[in-house]
Regions:
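ATP-dependent adenylation/nucleotidyltransferase module used to activate substrates
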Residues: 1-105, 116, 124-126, 132
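AMP-forming adenylation/ATP pyrophosphatase catalytic core
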Residues: 73-80, 89-260
Length: 260
């Protein structure tokens, strides 16, 4: 409610109409439920990607168009640039500490063409200074957290609360398959270092620190914003988690939406 009131007051300061839409059920279905289901599959989800894809640039964008809006402007820290051939590209923000391009990866060409990120070229301190100069009540409001519906960071409890299902006990095994003990459920335990999760056998694979790292991975759910799927191996910098430092790598397309 505080966020809604802040938005109303800022809209009043700017002389803009302020609307409130209730997408509680959609948020639960498209973000929270998907988050819980992914954990139950042994995956590590990023609900911010789903929130942007299905809520902000899905339902909210559709409602904005219905209201006659030409573009959707948000406070995301990212940049949009049009290429010489007319296509749009998503770029990182000027402030690397606040860059949110990672969680906007599902934006399409059509969405990029009708989206504006006015904060993309600013540092957070500059954005706050502008907000303060214009008398915005939220100029010094605390930054939002990565997962808004798990404020305490207890993902296991959140999954149980969302699904109503208790995690089934299983075995801890090392990288050689040797049993090490039992766990309370695959969403609840991470002693030592988790090297893998075998969902069909309900096993958490543990290993030493040096066994944790890998020089390659397979990824699915790829979004090629340009519309062109690379036909040859591509040298890029990449990361697998939000705010993680990028690393150089070679990406090879292996399927319709998969890469190695």
């Amino acid at each position: 409610l505080d966020d809604v009131e802040d938005a109303r007051r800022v809209a009043y300061t700017l002389g803009m109409p302020h609307y409130v839409f209730n997408y509680k059920d959609a948020f639960h279905e498209q973000v929270m439920a998907r988050f819980a289901a992914a954990y139950q599959r042994g995956a590590t989800p990023n609900p911010c990607l789903d929130c942007n894809r299905y809520l902000k640039f899905g339902l909210l964008e559709s409602r904005a168009r219905a209201l006659g809006c030409d573009v959707l402007a948000t406070g995301h820290y990212a940049r949009i640039e049009q290429l010489p051939d007319g296509r749009w590209t998503l770029k990182k923000a000027a402030d690397p500490e606040k860059d949110q391009s990672y969680v906007l990866a599902w934006l399409t060409q059509e969405q990029l063409a009708h989206t504006r990120f006015p904060l993309g070229g600013l540092r957070k301190s500059e954005a706050r200074a502008i907000a303060e100069a214009h008398g915005f009540c939220n100029a010094h409001k605390h930054d939002s957290q990565d997962i808004c519906f798990v404020p305490d960071g207890d993902y296991a409890a959140a999954v149980e609360r969302l699904t109503g299902a208790h995690s089934e006990p299983g075995r801890f095994v090392d990288t050689q398959g040797r049993p090490l003990g039992t766990h309370r459920g695959i969403t609840a335990e991470t002693p030592l270092y988790v090297c893998g999760i075998d969902v069909p056998n309900n096993e958490v694979v543990l290993g030493r620190n040096e066994e944790l790292f890998s020089t390659e991975l397979d990824a699915s759910g790829c979004s090629w914003i340009s519309g062109d799927v690379p036909q040859q191996p591509l040298r890029v910098t990449a990361r697998i988690r939000y705010r993680q430092p990028e690393q150089p790598c070679t990406v090879t397309v292996t399927g319709a939406d998969t890469v190695h």
